[in-house]
């Protein structure tokens, strides 16, 4: 199966500047294509997983993935579909975040000097040295403000009478220049991104055409939500991070294990490397087979992101907890100061401190709704004092929020 054919078959396709021509070119030759990532955290989360899998698909078909870390543009902020102005990051934060993002990406793609090896660039390398007057002189005349004002991302802010600073308005010019720079210096002929980036991508392609006459393309992916409308990558407990220092492989496994029934087939297509035969089997699941399919999906996605050993450990932990009722040492763990437990802490405060509730009021609500357990026993009094007497084997306390969220408290 060719790159574009598989791209469409997996559900990645939304829009392309010239799909027929891009299909023909990628059949005849290998290209370089790039995707940009915000440099706003020390890890990517599953909201970026489709873009990462596209980079992986490019590499598998012999094309060269280029990853752009927005070290330069992160100093400004992308107004695209954002209701508020973004916080501007320091150089130190950007460098730290870039290191973590490369760690996320290295789980899925190979970086190096080979023809199809990925490279990662920070657009600060060329944007930081910009002279503003030179930029206006050399590139300003190629951009139409009339057209920029018609872009949905800008129009949305203006219609709501929300603040759109000149700083942010310049973001789309810089992203367009990124594409031009990569086309000129790395022979990059394709920019990929979410459908919310369409206007910025087209501006870059137009800039290249006007200056150099090169044939380049833009292609976007659909913006994904779960079947219930929730944003991919976010849960009530926070983001589903790819790096294990922010989210354990067990919690990563549990996220996919607990996905909605209606999402199984779509997630399998988007995020796994199951064969077509396996995908066909997912599409014809009987009701009694859904749980087994979720386990298989969670196992495969955890193996892809972390390792087969991590996937095995996550599966074994889940079996011990949910099927055998045991306590497993691989459960996520939080450490509580011994003095706190010796003095005693109320049940609702403990659930909040352990991260099983985002606020103390939410912890109270969890307990009042009979959703909280300590050492597998229902917590009936939110003010019950928890102390060292609750330690199992003098080591841990097991907290459970609902049937699927468990954590160990150690001192």
Swiss-Prot record:
Superkingdom of origin: Bacteria
Pfam families: SYY_C-terminal, tRNA-synt_1b
UniProt EC number: 6.1.1.1
MF annotations from Gene Ontology: ATP binding; RNA binding; tyrosine-tRNA ligase activity
Main location: cytoplasm
CDD domains listed in its UniProt record: S4, TyrRS_core
Keywords attached to this entry: Aminoacyl-tRNA synthetase, ATP-binding, Cytoplasm, Ligase, Nucleotide-binding, Protein biosynthesis, RNA-binding
Gene3D superfamilies documented for this protein: HUPs, RNA-binding S4 domain, Tyrosyl-Transfer RNA Synthetase
GO biological process: tyrosyl-tRNA aminoacylation
Secretion signal, residue range per the UniProt entry: none
Binding site for ATP: 234
InterPro entries: aa-tRNA-synth_Ic, Rossmann-like_a/b/a_fold, S4_RNA-bd_sf, SYY-like_C, Tyr-tRNA-ligase, Tyr-tRNA-ligase_bac-type, Tyr-tRNA-ligase_bac_1
Compartment annotation: Cytoplasm
Catalytic reactions on record: tRNA(Tyr) + L-tyrosine + ATP = L-tyrosyl-tRNA(Tyr) + AMP + diphosphate + H(+)
HAMAP family: Tyr_tRNA_synth_type1
Cross-referenced NCBIfam families: tyrS
Quaternary structure and partners: Homodimer.
Role description: Catalyzes the attachment of tyrosine to tRNA(Tyr) in a two-step reaction: tyrosine is first activated by ATP to form Tyr-AMP and then transferred to the acceptor end of tRNA(Tyr).
Family stated for the protein in its record: Belongs to the class-I aminoacyl-tRNA synthetase family. TyrS type 1 subfamily.
Name of this protein: Tyrosine--tRNA ligase
């Amino acid at each position: 199966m060719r790159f574009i054919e598989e791209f469409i078959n997996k559900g990645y396709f939304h829009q392309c500047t010239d799909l027929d021509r891009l299909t023909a070119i990628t059949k005849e030759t290998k290209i370089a294509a790039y995707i940009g990532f915000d440099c706003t955290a020390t890890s990517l989360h599953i909201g970026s997983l489709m873009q990462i899998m596209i980079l992986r698909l490019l590499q598998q078909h012999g094309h060269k993935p280029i990853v752009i870390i927005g070290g330069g543009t992160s100093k400004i902020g992308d107004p695209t579909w954002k209701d508020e102005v973004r916080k501007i990051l320091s150089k130190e934060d950007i460098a730290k975040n870039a290191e973590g993002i490369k760690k996320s990406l290295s789980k899925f793609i190979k970086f190096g000097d080979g023809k199809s090896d990925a490279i990662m660039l920070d657009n600060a390398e060329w944007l930081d040295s910009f002279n503003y007057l030179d930029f206006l002189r050399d590139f300003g005349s190629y951009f139409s403000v009339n057209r920029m004002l018609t872009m949905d991302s800008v129009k949305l802010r203006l219609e709501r009478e929300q603040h759109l600073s000149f700083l942010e308005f310049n973001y789309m010019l810089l992203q367009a220049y990124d594409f031009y720079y990569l086309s000129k210096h790395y022979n990059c002929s394709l920019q990929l991104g979410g459908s919310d980036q369409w206007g910025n991508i087209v501006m870059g392609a137009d800039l290249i055409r006007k200056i150099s006459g090169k044939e380049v393309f833009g292609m976007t992916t659909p913006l994904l939500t779960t079947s219930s409308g929730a944003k991919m990558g976010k849960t009530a407990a926070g983001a589903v991070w790819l790096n294990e220092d922010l989210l354990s492989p067990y919690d990563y496994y549990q996220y996919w294990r607990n996905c909605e029934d209606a999402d199984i087939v779509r997630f399998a297509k988007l995020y796994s490397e199951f064969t077509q035969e396996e995908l066909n089997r997912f599409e014809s699941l009987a009701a009694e087979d859904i749980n087994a399919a979720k386990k298989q999906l969670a196992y495969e996605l955890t193996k892809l992101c972390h390792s087969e050993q991590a996937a095995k450990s996550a599966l074994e932990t889940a079996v011990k907890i949910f099927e055998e009722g045991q306590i497993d040492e691989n459960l996520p763990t939080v450490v509580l100061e011994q003095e706190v437990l010796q003095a005693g802490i109320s049940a609702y405060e403990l659930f909040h401190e352990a991260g099983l509730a985002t606020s103390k009021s939410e912890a109270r609500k969890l307990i009042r709704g009979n959703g909280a357990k300590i050492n597998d026993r229902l917590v009936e009094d939110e003010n019950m004092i928890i102390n060292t007497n609750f330690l199992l084997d003098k080591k841990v306390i097991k907290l459970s929020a609902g049937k699927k969220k468990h954590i160990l408290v150690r001192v």
